[in-house]
UniProtKB/Swiss-Prot annotation:
Subunit and interaction comment: Homodimer.
Enzyme class: isomerase
Tagged with keyword Plastid: no
Organism: Streptococcus pyogenes serotype M18 (strain MGAS8232)
Pfam families: Rib_5-P_isom_A (PF06026)
Chain segments annotated as transmembrane: none
Protein name listed in UniProt: Ribose-5-phosphate isomerase A
Length: 227
């Protein structure tokens, strides 16, 4: 599995060229993309500026010598490469297994080309077998938990040891065990309109390419262009 993740990450790095501003994703597959960019910066003199999606990725990039800028200091990003926890046939996805979904979505939004790197096990018919992360403000989180419970969403707080995990943005994550999300777009809109929800892990209609690594090789899937 790790070998497939590495292949996907290294393949994505081939899309990066001199002078780009690139979004550096978070997670076990995006890790290999960042490592390969670091190698190219050091060995090939690749000139890029990175924008990171988590404190973990920031530390990784700094160790590798990748120059970084804050999202607040840029207007657009040429290319962002990130992982995904599930991707369906309509190129909607669930992200946030690494608890970085808010920053990941903020970085993805001004990106000209958004690429996900996954192994073949992440490609699914319907989203929802992977629990859907919902980032919520700490104030009122228990009330919101009960709202989700009454709706039948089987919520659970993301934990770190014996305590609730706190994200880089100082929020909690409630994971929803939905089983199957029949209409990800509609459910995303529902969560968008829920007071106390900061962001959710449904990334609908955002990705441009999905690089899938399997035992048979690497496949690059192109999402249909809107309009």
């Amino acid at each position: 599995m790790e070998a497939l993740k590495k292949i996907a990450g290294v393949t994505a790095a081939q899309y990066v060229t001199d002078g780009m501003t690139i979004g550096l994703g978070t997670g076990s597959t995006a890790y290999y993309f960042v490592e390969e960019i670091g190698r190219r910066v050091k060995q090939e003199g690749l000139q890029v500026v990175g924008v990171t999606t988590s404190s973990v990725t920031s530390k990784q990039a700094e160790v590798l010598g990748i120059p970084l800028k804050s999202i607040d200091d840029i207007d657009s990003i040429d290319l962002t490469v990130d992982g995904a926890d599930e991707v369906d046939k309509d190129f909607n996805g669930i992200k946030g297994g690494g608890a970085a979904l808010l920053m990941e979505k903020i970085v993805a939004t001004p990106t000209k080309e958004y690429i996900w790197v996954v192994d073949a096990s992440k490609m699914v018919e319907h989203l929802g077998a992977f629990k859907l992360p919902v980032e919520v403000v700490q104030y009122g989180a228990d009330r919101l938990f009960r709202v989700f419970e009454k709706a039948g969403y089987k919520p659970s707080f993301r934990m770190k040891g014996d305590s609730r995990l706190v994200t880089d943005m100082q929020n909690y994550i409630i994971d929803l065990d939905l089983g199957c999300i029949k209409d990800p777009v509609a459910f995303g809109h529902l969560l968008d309109g829920t007071v106390g929800v900061v962001e959710h892990g449904l990334f609908n209609g955002m990705v441009d390419k999905v690089i899938v690594a399997s035992k048979d090789g690497v496949t690059v899937l192109e999402a249909p262009k809107a309009g």
